[in-house]
Design a protein with these regions (language model features):
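Acidic, glycine-rich loop-and-strand cores that form catalytic or ligand-binding grooves
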Residues: 117-148
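Short alpha-beta junction capping motif
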Residues: 22, 74-113
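Short, surface-exposed beta-strand/loop micro-motifs that present aromatic residues
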Residues: 64-65, 156-172
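Sec-dependent N-terminal signal peptides
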Residues: 3-13
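Sec-exported extracytoplasmic/periplasmic mature domains
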Residues: 48-52, 98-101, 120-124, 212-213
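Surface-exposed patches in mature extracellular/periplasmic domains of secreted proteins
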Residues: 53-62, 105-108, 126-134
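Aromatic-Pro/Gly-enriched surface loop or interdomain linker
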Residues: 17-74, 78-81, 171, 179-180, ...
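Stable alpha-helical elements in mature extracytoplasmic
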Residues: 39, 43, 89-92, 111-119, ...
């Protein structure tokens, strides 16, 4: 999982002329949208330290109906429990994603059923499709020939990367049975060994890079 080329660095740098940031989605329904609070700052720190990208490495969070959310084309959603979007939030998320926005949803174990249900409300005529291991997202910056890394075992199922597309553009990436966010957390939280945490962080870089250059 090494850097694939100097060309990628140049492209990444030019795409991110301004500081890159992520907005965590504050959703309703009772689920812990705030879980893994150190994950996004750690991912953005890793991104800045290992690529030419300048970042705002803060845990920025807002609701889908907040006006400021339009300043953040890269959205992140995670949690262990239920998600319930209001009708206004459904419309807002659909509008953001259809206007060059991108959502990475990471199941932190327990999010799956409600996320799929709410995504169907946002895009009733679109389906999540599994990404093969040779998809460009697994090679966009670091190499993952075996696809999505697995951080925590949970039910012992293989990790899955599923995506929703608008024509050829990926607008939603859903990482399931992988728990990338736990891998981005401070080492003391889960006490995962560094190789597992590093794989999660590098996959996070790939996701960001792919979303910006597709």
């Amino acid at each position: 999982m090494k850097l694939i080329s100097l060309i990628s660095i140049v492209i990444f740098s030019s795409v991110n002329a301004q500081s890159f940031s992520v907005a965590r989605v504050h959703y309703g329904g009772g689920g812990d949208w705030y879980s893994d609070p150190s994950s996004i700052p750690n991912l953005l720190t890793y991104l800045e330290e290992n690529t030419p990208v300048s970042t705002i490495n803060e845990d920025i969070h807002m609701k889908l109906t907040d006006k400021e959310i339009n300043q953040y084309p890269y959205l992140y959603m995670t949690g262990h429990g239920n998600i319930r979007l209001t009708e206004d939030e459904v419309i807002s998320l659909r509008t953001i994603l259809m206007n060059n926005g991108f959502l990475h949803a990471d199941d932190n174990y327990g999010l799956d059923a409600s996320f799929r249900r709410e995504l169907k409300r946002v895009f009733p005529n679109k389906e999540l499709v599994p990404l093969p291991n040779d998809h460009p997202i697994f090679y966009s910056y670091y190499r993952f020939p075996n696809g999505l890394p697995k951080v925590h075992e949970h039910d012992g199922k293989p990790p899955q990367a599923l995506a929703l597309f608008d024509e050829d553009r990926m607008i939603v990436l859903y990482t399931y049975e992988s728990d990338l966010g736990d891998g981005w957390e401070d080492a003391s939280v889960h006490e995962d060994p560094w190789p597992i945490r590093e794989a999660a962080l590098q996959m996070g870089v790939n996701i960001i890079y792919y979303s910006l250059t597709q």
